[in-house]
Amino acid sequence: MSTGGATTPSEGWNRFWFRQIPPHVYAVLRIAFGVLCLLDLLGATPISMFWDLNGIAPLPGGGPLGFRSWVVASGFAPAAAWMVFTGTLLAYLCMTLGIGGNAAVIASLVAHVWQTAWNVLPLSAAHQVLTAVLFSLVWADCGQVLTVSPLQNAVTPALRQSIAPLRVLQYQVCLIYFSSGVSKFSSELWRDGSAIYYAMSHNIVQRFPLDVVPLSFQGVATLTTYGTLVFELAFPFLVAWRRTRVLTLLAGVGLHLGAWVTLEVGPFSWVMIATYIAFLPPERLATLVDEVWQRKAARYRPSTPSQGL
């Protein structure tokens, strides 16, 4: 997140927001979040429970002009849940595999937002983060590399893309952490260091059933509470500085893995870890992806028999 090499403020601004980068980082983000969207969708099953008009989250709009009334009147009510679920599933699959290019990413964003309108569940904050990521990706060409399309994979070299969508995603991640830290700081439980201890004692969010969390754990819980608070408030500043970026991202991975191991937070931990891809150096990531892709292609390329004289 630096302007490296700029000689004037104007050049620094243009380099920071608009310099051209390899498209590989967008492709990796597309695949990672395509998989996460699929997992998030499959978590809202069985379909009859989560998607049916009369499931645990009934479709709203039952008035004379409501959407629910329109679906019932159209005659599609028995199949509506399957139609919406299947359409969303296909959009996510196409995005993950790179089929349809940006059209698949746009369709995934529409389907993801539509899922919230159709079904007020899931309750995980991961859904909101996924929406923010998909919004950032629609502004970049994510389908140039790492696709199942032979035509796309034959494009050499891949066209470079503006870094602007990546910057938007980076700032959204920073805003997520900072706003979460401010919200936590307004809670007395976070200020007195007891939030993690009480979360571990809560039978709804605790992953392992503990009737009583041992008092010996209280010191660790207090340290973890304050550490989480400091990390979230400081994340935007630490990740912006190159010298502390790697350590900050590693600390974030540890934080989210710890939360996933001890608490029922849904896919949120994995979604946030995946956003760290946006902070990796695009050029180095492109080199690594190309090396892995070429090595894989060489492994499956049929060998050419040697020609005799």
Where are these regions (language model features)?
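Alpha-helical membrane-anchoring segments
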Residues: M1-L309
